[in-house]
A protein has these predicted regions:
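Catalytic donor/gating beta->alpha subdomain of glycosyltransferases that bind UDP-sugars
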Residues: 148, 152-180, 210-213, 218-280, ...
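Cell-envelope/extracellular polymer assembly enzymes that use nucleotide-activated donors
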Residues: 39-42, 70
Length: 382
């Protein structure tokens, strides 16, 4: 009984953190006013094998209601028609420029090197990195620049709306935001000057140019597979201000459209954690299992198999209802499928399986694959 009360108490603390995050996260939107003086912004798009996404992304970026910006796209040695598509689009859009990436040098991970090349060619006093699988509202740039300038940030990143077009995405992607918003005290991290991990997300990273180069640009994170999180840490180390916002009203993305991409994408995250501390990954999943998954099993077992006292059932039922309410709130705020809470246990089971897969690859020393490139554990440690 005491154990179940402790689990419920932990769940309520997670719920409180979730509520504080949703309450205090800033939300750029159509209602944001224009800046009196609009700084010139370079929108930088690294693209590798993005023929299915790049045209939609550029169509949304070229129609921004912001007066001063350029769009640079770097084809990172794609094996598909990404470069051909961008070349066709730029003929009618002089603000769009296509760059061709250099071969990946020794000691660099792929995306950091692509971003570094883009930044070297950027002319803006602000630099915005966006992924090629993102789509943006016409007022995106106006609204995020208003927040970034007013808040005097060194790096602004955030949580876009995640579209789900298949069952694997419905199982995992809504669960991702549930975990992030429950675990990370974003409301606190946005205001502390301590050098703690940040919730920087590589799909959208906005810098003043001088702050980007102050830390050395992407060269500071050149060995990182999940370079976004580490870039936030570097900004904090340099005394800069990091801010994470809710981007769901100005940007959406459709990540990991196949099961294979989803496994690869999550595997690189877990691989990076394992390379730093296998014990940390084990601890995270132990907590996730006990707090977010086990209550469902306990309830079924207590009702149908091992008959438990009524007060025990009430406590475990409260655990399950708390999880469901938290899931529904997150799905509502980020416009996710509201029935996805029914798939909640499958989301945790999927991530545990991928974590075990990453652990096995790390133990065997075979590295982890991402977009046709193989990375070894040395790409996670400076």
């Amino acid at each position: 009984m005491i154990f179940q009360i402790i689990i419920l108490a932990i769940l309520l603390l997670f719920a409180l953190n979730l509520a504080l995050n949703l309450l205090f996260l800033k939300r750029p939107s159509k209602a944001d006013e224009k800046l009196d003086k609009a700084p010139f912004v370079s929108i930088l798009v690294p693209a590798r094998n993005e023929e299915a996404n790049i045209e939609r992304c550029l169509d949304s970026l070229k129609n921004q209601d912001y007066p001063a910006y350029e769009i640079l796209v770097l084809d990172d040695n794609s094996l598909d028609k990404t470069a051909e598509i961008v070349s066709r689009i730029q003929k009618d859009n002089p603000a769009i420029k296509l760059l061709h990436g250099k071969p990946l040098p020794e000691g660099w991970a792929g995306k950091p090197f692509a971003c570094y090349q883009l930044a070297q060619q950027a002319e803006g006093s602000w630099i915005l990195f966006v992924d090629a699988d993102t789509v943006h509202a016409p007022y995106m740039l106006r609204s995020v620049m208003k927040v970034a300038v007013d808040q005097k940030v060194s790096l602004l990143s955030g949580l876009p709306r995640q579209l789900t077009s298949g069952l694997p995405q419905m199982i995992v992607m809504p669960f991702m935001y549930f975990l992030v918003l429950s675990w990370f005290p974003i409301w606190f991290l946005n205001h502390t000057t301590k050098r703690w991990p940040t919730l920087a997300i590589g799909q959208f990273m906005l810098f003043p140019r001088d702050q980007y180069w102050k830390v050395g640009g992407h060269q500071a994170v050149k060995t990182r597979i999940i370079e976004d999180v580490w870039f936030g840490v570097e900004i904090k180390k340099a005394g800069g201000r990091f801010m994470s916002v809710d981007l769901s009203q100005v940007m959406f993305t459709n990540m990991y459209k196949s099961m294979g991409l989803m496994v690869e994408g999550w595997a690189k995250w877990f691989y990076s954690i394992i390379a730093l501390s296998p014990l940390a990954l084990f601890g995270l999943f132990a907590i996730a299992y006990l707090v977010f998954l086990a209550p469902f099993f306990w309830l079924v077992n207590g009702l149908m198999l091992d008959k438990q006292p009524v007060d025990w059932i009430i406590i475990v039922l409260a655990q399950v209802l708390t999880i469901i309410v938290m899931r529904c709130v997150v799905d509502y705020c980020f416009q996710g499928p509201l029935f996805s809470f029914l798939l909640h246990p499958l989301g945790i089971i999927f991530l545990i399986c991928v974590a075990l897969y990453s652990t096995a690859r790390h133990a065997m020393g075979v590295g982890i694959a991402w977009k046709g490139r193989l990375y070894e554990s040395r790409f996670n440690i400076k």
